[in-house]
Amino acid sequence: KDIEQATGILSGSIYYHFKKKEEIRNILFQETAAKIVEEVSRYADCSNPYQAFMLNNFFTWYKIFHNIKYRRFFLESPIGNASLDYYIDNFYGFKKILSPEVAEKIHFSRMDLALCYGVDSGLGSYIIENYDEYTKTHDYIYTSERELTLYATILKINPEIYRSELN
């Protein structure tokens, strides 16, 4: 009935094509994910693979966190909210060891930190996949400062640049 109300299509017609709600959900998720990847890919055209990864991940999570349905799914569940609280506590503890030049640029709202949390969730896998090459020239503090500077720069951009397609 929920699907019928949301789409205006009779449930008999829907279930003629889809036997279970899960099939509909899977198709919708795949289509939504494909749209997000398509929109985000234009921001990730960078010569630096790390920055390209971070931008791609950033804008993907931005889209997720600014869509109320996705935000509820990821952050308003007890586990997601507890994970975010833990991340924020660690973030402010970590901020104390950053260089003063970087630390003074970092002023994030809870939503901004939620976005950073999502981006960071993919950072570990990126570094692991590129560990040998990455560790030749980077260390954890360098990586974190660079990442936080990137976040601060993007979050100060005129919101229309990355919010125009969200409405």
Task: Annotate the PLM regions.
Residues 6, 23-45, 55, 59-62:
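Alpha-helical structural segments
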Residues 51-55, 59, 82-85, 89, ...:
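Short, well-structured alpha-helical interface segments that form or flank functional binding sites
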Residues 1-23, 27:
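Helix-turn-helix
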Residues 107-127, 138-141, 148-151:
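A conserved mid-domain beta-alpha-beta active-site/ligand-binding segment of alpha/beta enzyme cores
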Residues 96-100, 129-167:
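C-terminal peripheral helix-coil segments that are non-catalytic and often amphipathic
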Residues 46-75, 141-152:
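Amphipathic alpha-helical segments that line or abut small-molecule/effector binding pockets
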Residues 65-113, 125-132:
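Short secondary-structure transition hinges
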Residues 37, 41, 120-128, 132:
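Regular secondary-structure segments
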